[in-house]
Amino acid sequence: MIQQESRLKVADNTGAKEILCIRVLGGSSRRYAGIGDIIVATVKDAIPGGTVKRGDVVKAVVVRTVKERRRPDGSYIKFDENAAVIIKADNDPRGTRIFGPVGRELRDKKFMKIVSLAPEVL
């Protein structure tokens, strides 16, 4: 469950290490984002020489949340950290690698490029 001012780890190789959520997309009064939801964020920490730099405003898709999510079969999924992948305007990832597992909900929401790059889909 990600909201405004939430900080997330970046799970790709764009050069950003941490982002801060500034808006949850999907309606004027939408408050929370879960796995597979798109947010607008600003880069708070980045490595030198990366494709994004500190202060950039980017769009990202949430791939891991600490808050558990109930699946249609009744099972729950939760992770040890909140993480996101920075995306382009066409919802393809800006980086070329994804680090760590991602939720199966990304496949349902048509983020196939992220799912194919991820080392593990839970």
From Swiss-Prot:
Domain of life: Bacteria
A cellular-component GO term for this protein: cytosolic large ribosomal subunit
SUPFAM superfamilies: Ribosomal protein L14
Molecular-function annotations in GO: large ribosomal subunit rRNA binding; structural constituent of ribosome
Gene Ontology biological process: translation
Keywords: Ribonucleoprotein, Ribosomal protein, RNA-binding, rRNA-binding
Presence of the UniProt keyword Cell cycle in the record: no
Family according to the record: Belongs to the universal ribosomal protein uL14 family.
Record note on quaternary structure: Part of the 50S ribosomal subunit. Forms a cluster with proteins L3 and L19. In the 70S ribosome, L14 and L19 interact and together make contacts with the 16S rRNA in bridges B5 and B8.
NCBIfam families: rplN_bact
Function: Binds to 23S rRNA. Forms part of two intersubunit bridges in the 70S ribosome.
Record's protein name: Large ribosomal subunit protein uL14
Organism of derivation: Mycobacteroides abscessus (strain ATCC 19977 / DSM 44196 / CCUG 20993 / CIP 104536 / JCM 13569 / NCTC 13031 / TMC 1543 / L948)
Organism placement in taxonomy: Bacteria, Bacillati, Actinomycetota, Actinomycetes, Mycobacteriales
